[in-house]
């Protein structure tokens, strides 16, 4: 079978364009914000429910599209999203509503994970010319500093009640990983070194300190309130949307990507070796040698505990493979980059309507025709393409 040139600027830009066309302009709700639930054919199947993660990720998508194409409609869509984020998601307490339905707030819990994407959205808003977003970044950072930052551990706690009075005992690496990503973006937008310094601290404390608590020196997902590994959290719910049990190969490779992105901004001699280690081990343990693709999760003993194939795992991994190839010139990573794309091209990408299927089973079959429920937006796939594009010469 012949494939496109997956490592070419022309291909990556065309793929982003087709993915954007799946969502835009259908996703624009003239009443405010974005529709967030799409069937395989692009039709909206829930016009009312809005999730903070989708509301912010769409802003990223449109801002990045504008920055790379200079198409004004994309900037207008990003601004449309910012207005909804500030008018509807932002609460009087200073936090952001996690889930809402029209005029009803369904879940007002304050999540660090959600606030990470608020910072990412504001950073992108600043990059497309909304100068007031620099203050919004600062205010959100200060909010996190006041309520979420645990100086003793050098990490962010995970969730707090809407009135800021009840702190969940759960601690997780996922929110800290996305805070690292968001703070790098904040640094890029503002050039304020405190954001990069914090991103570097998060990377060190998760990828070195917390990873050292696991026997394999990989990043476990779940922790107790004193940041000790909780091996049993969601053990009976391995498919939990945001907190699945097991090592997440997609998060090992996503950290590999982030470490290499940090290395570009402020080099440290441990970034590349750790990125290689996390990526190599995850790829070895999670790659389906019979049917292709990376599985979703594996147990501490290395056996696969969730054989499904998720879109974002393949996308984050091809970005990491490419950055590793660029950093090491090792052809193994180039081949893995192509292999991940070939699997995705054959099974995960909808060549009829555009965008990626969210999830496949271990036999590479779809579970349903809900391509893009809340939280997806193809932020991972397009974001991965943009990271590769940044390294390609014009």
Swiss-Prot record:
Source species, domain of life = Bacteria
Ordered alphabetically, the record's keywords are: Isomerase
Which SUPFAM superfamilies does the entry mention? Six-hairpin glycosidases
**Parts of the chain that traverse the membrane:** none
Activity as a function of temperature is given as: Optimum temperature is 30 degrees Celsius with D-mannose as substrate.
Which reaction is catalysed here? Answer: D-mannose = D-fructose; D-lyxose = D-xylulose
State the active site. Answer: 251, 380
Field pH dependence: Optimum pH is 7.3 with D-mannose as substrate.
Q: What is its EC number?
A: 5.3.1.7
Query: Top enzyme class of this protein?
Result: isomerase
Molecular functions per Gene Ontology: isomerase activity
- GO BP term, example: carbohydrate metabolic process
According to its UniProt entry, what is the function of this protein?
Answer: Catalyzes the reversible isomerization of D-mannose to D-fructose. Can also isomerize D-lyxose, with lower efficiency. In longer reaction with a higher concentration of enzyme, it can isomerize 4-OH D-mannose derivatives (D-talose and 4-O-monosaccharyl-D-mannose). Cannot use D-glucose.
Assigned protein family:
Belongs to the N-acylglucosamine 2-epimerase family.
Q: How does it assemble?
A: Monomer.
Q: What is known of its domains?
A: The alpha7-alpha8 and alpha11-alpha12 loops of the catalytic domain may participate in the formation of an open substrate-binding site to provide sufficient space to bind 4-OH D-mannose derivatives.
Name under which the protein is recorded? D-mannose isomerase
Organism listed in the record? Marinomonas mediterranea (strain ATCC 700492 / JCM 21426 / NBRC 103028 / MMB-1)
């Amino acid at each position: 079978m012949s494939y496109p040139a997956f490592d070419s600027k022309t291909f990556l830009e065309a793929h982003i364009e087709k993915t954007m066309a799946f969502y835009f302009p259908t996703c624009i709700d003239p009443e405010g914000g974005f529709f967030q639930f799409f069937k395989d054919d692009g039709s909206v199947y829930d016009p009312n429910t809005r999730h903070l993660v989708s509301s912010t990720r769409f802003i990223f998508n449109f801002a990045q599209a504008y920055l790379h194409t200079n198409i004004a409609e994309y900037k207008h869509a990003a601004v449309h999203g910012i207005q909804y984020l500030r008018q509807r998601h932002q609460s009087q307490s200073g936090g952001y509503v996690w889930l809402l339905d029209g005029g009803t707030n369904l879940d007002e819990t304050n999540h660090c994970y959600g606030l990470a994407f608020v910072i990412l959205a504001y950073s992108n808003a600043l990059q497309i010319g909304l100068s007031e977003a620099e203050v919004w970044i600062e205010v959100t950072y200060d909010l996190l500093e006041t309520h979420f930052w645990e100086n003793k551990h050098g990490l962010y706690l995970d969730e707090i009640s809407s009135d800021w009075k009840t702190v969940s005992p759960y601690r997780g690496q996922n929110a800290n990983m996305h805070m690292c990503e968001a703070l790098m973006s904040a640094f890029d937008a503002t050039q304020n070194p405190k954001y990069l310094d914090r991103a570097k601290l998060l990377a060190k404390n998760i990828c070195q300190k917390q990873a050292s608590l696991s026997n394999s020196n990989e990043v476990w997902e779940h922790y107790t309130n004193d940041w000790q590994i909780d091996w049993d959290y969601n053990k009976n719910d391995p498919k939990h949307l945001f907190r699945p049990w097991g090592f997440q190969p997609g998060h090992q490779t996503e950290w590999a990507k982030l470490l290499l992105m940090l290395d570009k901004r402020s080099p440290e001699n441990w970034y590349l070796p750790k990125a290689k280690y996390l990526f190599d081990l995850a790829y070895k343990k999670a790659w389906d040698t019979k049917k292709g693709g990376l599985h979703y999760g594996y147990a501490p003993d290395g056996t696969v505990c969730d054989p499904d194939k998720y879109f974002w795992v393949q996308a984050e991994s091809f970005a990491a493979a490419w950055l590793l190839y660029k950093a090491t010139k090792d052809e193994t990573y180039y081949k893995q980059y192509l292999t991940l794309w070939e699997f995705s091209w054959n099974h995960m990408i909808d060549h009829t309507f555009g965008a990626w299927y969210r999830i496949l089973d271990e036999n590479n079959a779809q579970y349903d025709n809900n391509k893009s429920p809340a939280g997806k937006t193809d932020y991972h796939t397009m974001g991965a393409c943009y990271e590769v594009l940044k390294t390609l010469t014009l």
